């Protein structure tokens, strides 16, 4: 965030509504060039090998304006109007430039609001993905019903652009944005296919996430407004965007400006114990009361998406279940409320009573099947979880191969240390350990047993299981009982700011 300060101060002197001139500033594409597009834990971080040119960027923008949009033939899609340039490379550069420019006014607004609220010091911890789990542990054990909701995608990207126009009044900027989407993102059909939108989101992640976050922000602002008006106790917590990789937004009282127009309480939504959590395109709605009120909110969401955002959604896609009988998936974990029953013997004078006490506990466990599926997709094991070698890494040195596998294990241990049961995590580590051994044996053209016997690498590979204990020993006292207790308990880290392939809720 510090790298934006210099450029944001330059934009502060200008009117925030006029973003079009910033598209032609060279420092914008300097940031776009250095931005890292790949955040997967399975590959190395890397930048572009090509050289970019601001002059080429300006030429491409000029050619977009010179195209004749009144004549559209069937062969237009096969023609490349940018001959001599790497179209895919420059589309990502321009897309990144659009995202950086449009983030500027909102980032300035966020910075000023954080300074006024005096929460700058705690802002980093609030941005952590793991910050949601203490909230779940504190609140969800007292709730009875949960609704697992998938936020539908807009049928056309034009809907996302129109939502952004309510906030930024710059006609030339949006005209250029539409031209870019038309040329680079196959926007020449009335209803884009789901595959084309998925391709655009993967090739232009920053711009797509910004537009999508704005769509979710609009829907959540209306939801929080009705929630605040539905009960006399106002919400004091934040409405949060947990995927703050590219778009930073954490606002308090999003709909405070509408309070003057609606001075009465909506009685049909009255529910003081309703809780809402969202990550990416998935949200969890939980309540303590009967499912009748949950059904009210369910149909409210459906009508809101269909009537206000022109997004089709069906009631059968939103299920309402009991927390004690249903597990929900969020942030790469499976969570459910477990009932612990205990019997207490009580004696009063000559009478003895047996009292059964039922307590609730939120179980957060590692989803072993999705993790194995992710490892199989990355070619570390097969679909059954049997480890296989990684031949594409065989050209590296032994140290680099081991370091790559250890880096993946560190990321997994760091993220999944909040699990109630560590057995599944140890199984994933075991798969990676054997995959590392098989990769080294494949490189040296030997069997696994012969390689271990010859090189004595078994002690080195024990780091897969001992490294996390060494990290904990630096934080907590070196007492065996204390370390054993922390291995059994959950540990949430407040420095996890980025998501990866393993925690995407597909």
From Swiss-Prot:
Belongs to the intron maturase 2 family. MatK subfamily. InterPro entries: Domain_X (IPR024937), Maturase_MatK (IPR002866), Maturase_MatK_N (IPR024942). The gene is matK. It comes from Trifolium gracilentum. Pfam families: Intron_maturas2 (PF01348), MatK_N (PF01824). Keywords: Chloroplast, mRNA processing, Plastid, RNA-binding, tRNA processing. GO terms for cellular component: chloroplast. This is Maturase K. It is found in: Plastid, Chloroplast. GO terms for biological process: mRNA processing; RNA splicing; tRNA processing. One of its GO terms (molecular function) is RNA binding. Usually encoded in the trnK tRNA gene intron. Probably assists in splicing its own and other chloroplast group II introns.
């Amino acid at each position: 965030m510090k790298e934006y300060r210099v450029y944001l101060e330059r934009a502060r002197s200008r009117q925030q509504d006029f973003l079009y001139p910033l598209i032609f500033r060279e420092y914008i594409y300097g940031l776009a060039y250095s931005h890292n597009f790949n955040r997967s834990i399975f590959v190395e971080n890397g930048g572009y090998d090509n050289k970019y040119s601001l002059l080429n960027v300006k030429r491409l923008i000029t050619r977009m304006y010179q195209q004749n949009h009144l004549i559209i033939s069937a062969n237009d899609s096969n023609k490349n109007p940018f001959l001599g340039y790497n179209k895919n490379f420059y589309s990502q550069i321009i897309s990144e430039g659009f995202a950086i420019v449009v983030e500027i006014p909102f980032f300035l607004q966020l910075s000023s609001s954080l300074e006024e609220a005096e929460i700058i010091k705690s802002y980093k911890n609030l941005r952590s993905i793991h910050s949601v789990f203490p909230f779940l542990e504190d609140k969800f054990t007292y709730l009875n019903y949960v609704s697992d909701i998938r936020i539908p995608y807009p049928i056309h990207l034009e809907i996302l652009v129109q939502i952004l126009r309510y906030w930024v009044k710059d006609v030339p900027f949006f005209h250029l944005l539409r031209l870019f989407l038309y040329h680079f993102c196959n926007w020449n059909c009335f209803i884009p296919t789901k595959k084309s939108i998925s391709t655009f989101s993967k090739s232009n992640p920053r711009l797509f996430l910004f537009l999508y976050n704005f769509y979710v922000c609009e829907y959540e602002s209306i939801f929080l407004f009705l929630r605040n008006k539905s009960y006399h106790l106002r919400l004091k917590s934040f409405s949060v965007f947990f995927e703050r990789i590219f778009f930073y937004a954490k606002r308090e009282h999003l709909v405070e400006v509408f309070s003057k127009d609606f001075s009465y309480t909506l009685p049909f939504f009255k529910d003081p114990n309703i809780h809402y959590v969202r990550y990416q395109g998935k949200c969890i709605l939980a309540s303590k009361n009967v499912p009748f009120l949950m059904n009210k909110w369910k149909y409210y969401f459906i009508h809101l998406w269909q009537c206000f955002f022109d997004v089709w959604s069906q009631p059968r896609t939103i299920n309402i279940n009991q927390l004690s009988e249903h597990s929900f998936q969020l942030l790469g974990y499976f969570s459910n409320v477990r009932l612990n029953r205990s019997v207490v013997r009580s004696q009063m004078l000559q009478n003895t009573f047996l009292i059964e006490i039922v307590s609730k506990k939120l179980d957060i466990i590692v989803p072993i099947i999705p993790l194995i599926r992710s490892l199989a997709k990355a070619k570390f094991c097969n679909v059954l979880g049997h480890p296989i070698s990684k031949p594409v890494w065989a050209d590296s040195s032994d140290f680099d191969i081991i370091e790559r596998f250890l880096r993946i294990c560190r990321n997994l241990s760091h993220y999944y240390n909040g699990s109630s049961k560590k057995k599944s995590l140890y199984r994933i580590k075991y798969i990676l350990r054997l995959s590392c051994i098989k990769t080294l044996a494949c490189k040296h053209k030997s069997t696994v047993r012969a390689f271990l016997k010859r090189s004595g690498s078994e002690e080195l590979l024990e780091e897969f299981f001992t490294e996390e204990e060494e990290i904990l020993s630096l934080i907590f006292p070196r007492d065996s009982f204390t370390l054993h207790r922390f291995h059994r308990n959950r540990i949430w880290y407040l420095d996890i700011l980025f998501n990866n392939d393993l925690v995407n809720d597909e």
